[in-house]
Structure formats: C-alpha cells, structure tokens
C-alpha cells in the first residue's frame, strides 16, 4: 500500500490536508512499521509546498518508497502558489533527485529487492495532443512520452 501526498498540499475550502510534508509522513509511516505501509513519492505534490525539502523527504523515507511520480513545479514569486512545468524546467533539480533514486535502487538490488516503479506525471499538452477529441488533462500521450524521454536521458547521463 502506498500513500500519495495531498495534491495540492494546501487546504482547500477550509478542508485540512492529511499528508503534505515530512512530519505527516513520519507520523503515518512510523505508526505501523511494515514495508507494506509505504509512500508514493510524488515530486510535484511535495515540491509545491515551499516548506518541503523533497531531497530530505526522499532520503528520510527511501526504504518505504513503493512508487514514484516524477513531476516538476515552479513556485510563483508570491511564494503562495505554483504551476506545473516541463520536467526539466521547474524548481525540482531532477538530476539530483534521479541520482538519489538510482542510489536507492542500487542499494535495493544488493538486498534482492525490486526496482522502484516510477513514471513521468502530468505531461504537457503538445500540438498533436490538442487536436485529439478526448484527452485527459495531464495525461496526454505525446506530452508524457516527451517527459519520459527527458527523464530517461537524465538516467542515462548519470548512470
């Protein structure tokens, strides 16, 4: 079982969020110590909270991360809002993050554990996607493939 962070990580309409930061995850994951009680590490959801250090969150819970969504965001100048960006152009340093992920996967492989499943999250709507009759916002085929190719390029470059 994996727990995805609140998306977005801020209260909406006065309804508080459940899990948006290191402290929230620590409370939940420490409440029942099991590899089955894990985290869906969503870089976009976590990075959209300006108080989060996603690299520290990853390092803290790396053994409990069961799935990864790779998405990038940019915090607005007002520090109160954010928007999604292309995978390589936001505030998240994907080279740094992917190095951490690969290091953890290497550790797991020594212990005969599986790789961490991951995927690009929320690809952008590119020209070809705009003419499709039915698209799911954030899940366009070509936009996600572009994100996947960028992420695979980083993996290849740092490996």
Give, region by region, the residue ranges found by the protein language model:
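Histidine-acidic metal/acid-base catalytic patches
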Residues: 10-159
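Helix-loop segments that flank and shape redox-cofactor active sites
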Residues: 7
């Amino acid at each position: 079982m994996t727990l995805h962070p609140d998306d977005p990580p801020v209260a909406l309409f006065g309804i508080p969020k459940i899990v948006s930061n290191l402290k929230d995850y620590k409370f939940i994951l420490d409440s029942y110590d099991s590899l089955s009680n894990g985290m869906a590490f969503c870089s976009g959801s976590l990075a959209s909270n300006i108080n989060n250090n996603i690299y520290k969150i990853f390092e803290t819970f790396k053994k409990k991360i069961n799935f990864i969504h790779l998405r990038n965001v940019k915090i607005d100048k007002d520090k109160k809002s954010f928007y999604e960006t292309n995978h390589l152009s936001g505030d998240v340093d994907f080279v740094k993050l992917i190095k951490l992920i690969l290091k953890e996967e290497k550790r797991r492989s020594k212990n005969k554990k599986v790789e961490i499943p991951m995927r690009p999250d929320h690809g952008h709507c590119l020209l070809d996607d705009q003419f499709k009759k039915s698209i799911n916002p954030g899940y366009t085929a070509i936009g996600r493939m572009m994100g996947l190719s960028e992420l695979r390029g980083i993996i290849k470059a740092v490996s």
